[in-house]
Amino acid sequence: MNGNGLALVPKWYTVAQVASLLGYGESRVRMLIIGGDLRSLKDGRSRRILPEWVDEYVQMRASQAEPTWWSQ
């Protein structure tokens, strides 16, 4: 909450927050960033990830999903 009683919504996530959202470890998220699968920006010594970039990654992974044997 800020001084006006309004909840602040983060405009970006940290690597730890993205790892928690996706159920991954932080090292896996960093590897996704290094590999270019997940976009990020450098903020000092940290990396920041916009929520829409997380959505892009999830959509990309969903489009690569193989059909399951029972849906064929």
Each PLM stretch: what is its role?
Residues 17, 38, 44, 60-63:
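N-terminal cationic amphipathic segment used for targeting or macromolecule association
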Residues 2-31, 60:
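Polyanion-binding surface elements
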Residues 10-12, 43, 47-48, 55-58:
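General detector of folded, globular domains
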Residues 5-6, 46, 50, 62-63:
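Intrinsically disordered, low-complexity regions enriched in Ser/Pro/Gly/Gln/His and often acidic
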Residues 52-72:
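A short, Lys/Arg-enriched interface patch at domain edges and termini
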Residues 21-48:
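Major-groove DNA-recognition helix of helix-turn-helix-type DNA-binding domains
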